[in-house]
């Protein structure tokens, strides 16, 4: 099928204090503008590389030695992220093989995955092992510049994702981020809702005309995939709220996804767009009749 990329997980706060980030250790993206545009450069995200003298994580020694250093508090939160990323690289083949086995099992045995696959096929789309692929998805420690005129400090986030959908390529499952088969099922269902929406309505993924398309499909995907059900929110994320928990989760995840669009200005803009389409999109359960998960 011809399933603009979306992601099912946005940046996550790492808890790394900005004061521990000397500018000499920060690298900028290779696609940055020329140095003459210094004002524009200040607005670009910067990505941190590991410095053992700062983080305590030394990739030249055995992994178990670094693990012991983590347990004894000798490695900073930033160093833990670098350690995790290196372990993902080392275990890439194992993680992808497990992801592919779980994907194939879900295609055969999961009621929600089989139902969505059938509905995609009814719209002349095909989702199978050729365009639902498992890959390692690198995470990056991002330095978000603060507004110096307002006295804001730089903010540190870890940018990672669980999966994605592209109309030109299909569905991506981030093998290194999948905790278990149930997590993969939620992620795959989320992206399959995007695929159905694209075949049904030709979604404006990048928000070139309007961000409302992106907001609506993100609301629907989070609502119908099961990723916001109470058991996952409470046990996995530690959110034990009983009232409006489901709605709050769907709204929050939709806002995070809309913020990743290039035409979205900030969280205020994303929230405004999500609120504009909330009533109509949250009540639209197609291709299901009810919310089953």
Swiss-Prot record:
Gene Ontology terms: biological process: mitochondrial protein processing; mitochondrial proton-transporting ATP synthase complex assembly
Primary location class: mitochondrion
Subcellular location: Mitochondrion inner membrane
A single GO cellular-component term on record: mitochondrial inner membrane
EC class: hydrolase
EC code(s) of this entry: 3.4.24.-
Gene Ontology MF, one: metal ion binding
Name the record gives this protein: Mitochondrial inner membrane protease atp23
Species whose genome carries this gene: Neurospora crassa (strain ATCC 24698 / 74-OR23-1A / CBS 708.71 / DSM 1257 / FGSC 987)
Taxonomic lineage: Eukaryota, Fungi, Dikarya, Ascomycota, Pezizomycotina
